[in-house]
Design a protein with these regions (language model features):
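Conserved beta-alpha-beta core of the PfkB/ribokinase-like small-molecule kinase fold
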Residues: 8-78
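Structural motif
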Residues: 7-8, 93
Length: 182
């Protein structure tokens, strides 16, 4: 299947050693000029090599961001200048998850969006980052607004972390309302 305008390409996950670290960059080059937004959720060189191609969204967590810049980042305030550096290198929107410390989005319009984590009990953080990306994308496609997309991302990631398995839409929406009131 060939990607076309209206499609979205998500490049996510760590790469096995047998795959070149520029594979995500190569895949992005294939869709250049086709008006296909690309989301990159990767680490290290696999992420950095995509930045000159201006991915629509990248989603490092605070530990991955710390490793990229060889610093320790634990707060939203510390994360912001380093997320801006990734924008300066080409990323349009940078979404950084900080686990229990919340999340930050630097959007393509220069706005900084911040959120605490909604109330809930951590059960399983595995997949919470993927759920955050899915929630962000869902929110963006619903309203094209960055604040709504950001809050949906935080809600979906949190709902996943508060669940044994996949979170349901009702839980995501409940957490979304909690985030919007904050």
């Amino acid at each position: 299947a060939v990607l076309k305008k209206g499609d979205i390409l998500i490049l996510s996950g760590s790469l096995p050693g047998s795959v070149p670290t520029d594979i995500y960059k190569t895949l992005m080059e294939e869709v250049q000029g086709k008006e296909i937004p690309v989301i990159v959720d990767a680490i290290g060189d696999a992420l950095l090599k995509t930045l000159p191609l201006h991915p629509f969204l990248i989603k490092p967590n605070h530990q991955e961001l710390s490793e990229l810049f060889c610093v320790e980042l634990t707060t939203r305030e510390q994360v912001v200048p380093y997320a801006k550096k990734l924008q300066e290198q080409g990323a349009r929107n940078v979404l950084v998850s900080l686990g229990g410390a919340g999340a930050v989005l630097l959007d393509q319009n220069g706005m900084v969006h911040e959120s605490d984590v909604p109330r809930g009990k951590l059960i399983n953080a595995v997949g919470a980052g993927d759920s955050m990306v899915a929630g962000f994308l869902t929110g963006y496609l619903e309203k094209q607004g960055m604040e709504h997309a950001f809050c949906m991302g935080v809600a979906a990631g949190s709902a996943s972390a508060f669940s044994e398995g996949l979170a349901d839409r009702e839980t995501v929406e409940q957490l979304y309302r909690q985030i919007r009131k904050a």
